[in-house]
């Protein structure tokens, strides 16, 4: 099921806001054990993905279709937002958020490159026929 850019902007913005609020509401519980600090980093990575989706959808609405997110400022801004939100919970959450976000960004890039990049035809060089050195 595919939704439009405006609907995706609204949904991803709402999910980003709810995830940030949930992380702040349960920050004491997320910082209580080792496994929950890793879970806090995973939630921060989800915040990164949702905020990047919202930011890119907003750019597509403003600048037109086909506008792609670049490393600076879109990805860095969303990553810093997610790392800041994770840092409000625990400092280990920042590290796990960064690791999970980089893994998620790798797979997002891999999937989007297979879907949206057109393959350029490969040009093979023509065989040069001519006189070369004569061998005796």
From Swiss-Prot:
Membrane-spanning residues: 6-23, 35-55, 76-108
Segments carrying motif Prevents secretion from ER: 133-136
Cytoplasmic side: 24-34, 109-136
Database matches in Pfam families: Keratin_assoc (PF09775)
Disulfide-bond pairs as recorded: none
GO cellular component, one term: endoplasmic reticulum membrane
GO biological process: protein N-linked glycosylation
Stretches of the chain found on the membrane's Lumenal side: 1-5, 56-75
Keyword Transmembrane set for record: yes
Principal location: endoplasmic reticulum
Topology term for the membrane: Multi-pass membrane protein
InterPro entries xrefs: KRTCAP2
Pathway stated in the Swiss-Prot or TrEMBL entry: Protein modification; protein glycosylation
Tagged with keyword Transmembrane helix: yes
Cellular localisation: Endoplasmic reticulum membrane
Origin: domain of life: Eukaryota
Swiss-Prot/TrEMBL keywords: Endoplasmic reticulum, Membrane, Phosphoprotein, Transmembrane, Transmembrane helix
Task of the protein: Subunit of STT3A-containing oligosaccharyl transferase (OST-A) complex that catalyzes the initial transfer of a defined glycan (Glc(3)Man(9)GlcNAc(2) in eukaryotes) from the lipid carrier dolichol-pyrophosphate to an asparagine residue within an Asn-X-Ser/Thr consensus motif in nascent polypeptide chains, the first step in protein N-glycosylation. N-glycosylation occurs cotranslationally and the complex associates with the Sec61 complex at the channel-forming translocon complex that mediates protein translocation across the endoplasmic reticulum (ER).
Family: Belongs to the KRTCAP2 family.
Known partners and oligomeric status: Component of STT3A-containing oligosaccharyl transferase (OST-A) complex. STT3A-containing complex assembly occurs through the formation of 3 subcomplexes. Subcomplex 1 contains RPN1 and TMEM258, subcomplex 2 contains the STT3A-specific subunits STT3A, DC2/OSTC, and KCP2 as well as the core subunit OST4, and subcomplex 3 contains RPN2, DAD1, and OST48. The OST-A complex can form stable complexes with the Sec61 complex or with both the Sec61 and TRAP complexes. Interacts with PSEN1 and NCSTN; indicative for an association with the gamma-secretase complex.
Protein name as it appears in the record: Dolichyl-diphosphooligosaccharide--protein glycosyltransferase subunit KCP2
Organism: Bos taurus
């Amino acid at each position: 099921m595919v939704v439009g850019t405006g609907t995706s902007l609204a949904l991803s913005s709402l999910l980003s806001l709810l995830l940030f609020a949930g992380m702040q509401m349960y920050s004491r519980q997320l910082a209580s054990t080792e496994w929950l600090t890793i879970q806090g980093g995973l939630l921060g990575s989800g915040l990164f993905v949702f905020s990047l989706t919202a930011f890119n959808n907003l750019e597509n609405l403003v600048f037109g279709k086909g506008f792609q997110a670049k490393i600076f400022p879109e990805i860095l801004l969303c990553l810093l937002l997610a790392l800041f939100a994770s840092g409000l919970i625990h400092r280990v959450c920042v590290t796990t958020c960064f690791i999970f976000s980089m893994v998620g960004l790798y797979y997002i890039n891999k999937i989007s490159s297979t879907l949206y990049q057109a393959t350029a035809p490969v040009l093979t060089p023509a065989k040069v026929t001519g006189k070369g050195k004569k061998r005796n």
